[in-house]
Amino acid sequence: MKFFIDTANIDEIKEANSMGMVDGVTTNPSLIAKEGRPFEDIIKDICAEVDGPISAEVISTEAKSMIEEGKKLAAIHKNIVIKIPMIPDGMIATRALSSEGIPVNVTLVFSPLQALVAAKAGAAFVSPFVGRLDDLANEGMLLIEQMVTIYNNYAFDTEVLVASVRNPLHVLEAAMMGADVATIPFGVIKKMMGHPLTDKGLAAFLADYEKSKK
């Protein structure tokens, strides 16, 4: 399973990358805005740090504008993936961009039919939002299971990119279901490495070592 980090903060990206936790990065307008720096500067810094897919999202909602914006974003770096919302105009843009060899990550996906449509349109990645679905009906992981089944049934090249990850259990369940990628906030990445027994065991080892020096 590939791990992407869901952030636009370069310090978080560098720290996670130093631990081998970053195969790619996803951003969105909200994450970019939090950094208080020019959009293109942030994206270029991320591309310089991570040699993998970097999702940058369009802000247009009309197909022609999304296509134009997507081409401009793709010109920033070879690793840019264009993030497109799951709307009818978005599927037109997805088809057009993917036909020109520009990879697309279809975002804001909440149903298996949306996921199927996005794959048919040529998306390289499709991002189901498991946390937001769980907020409504606790069905986030059911969607992942359905998507993996559908994509396997028809040998789609589209990758399931699990998004809106709220806790380590989301990552574990997605991995067990065979999802290709999880995009994970930095705080959740850190939680994935922790366990009370690890802390207890380390404390005991260190205490024994200190005793041995006396």
Swiss-Prot record:
The UniProt family comment states: Belongs to the transaldolase family. Type 3B subfamily.
Q: Where is the active site?
A: K83 (schiff-base intermediate with substrate)
Please report the organism this UniProt entry assigns to the protein.
Desulfatibacillum aliphaticivorans
**GO cellular component terms attached to this protein's record:** cytoplasm
Per the UniProt record, which EC number(s) apply here? 2.2.1.2
Indicate where this protein resides in the cell: Cytoplasm
Alphabetized Pfam families for the sequence:
TAL_FSA
Q: Which residues form the signal peptide?
A: none
Name the chain's protein: Probable transaldolase
The pathway this protein participates in, as annotated, is:
Carbohydrate degradation; pentose phosphate pathway; D-glyceraldehyde 3-phosphate and beta-D-fructose 6-phosphate from D-ribose 5-phosphate and D-xylulose 5-phosphate (non-oxidative stage): step 2/3
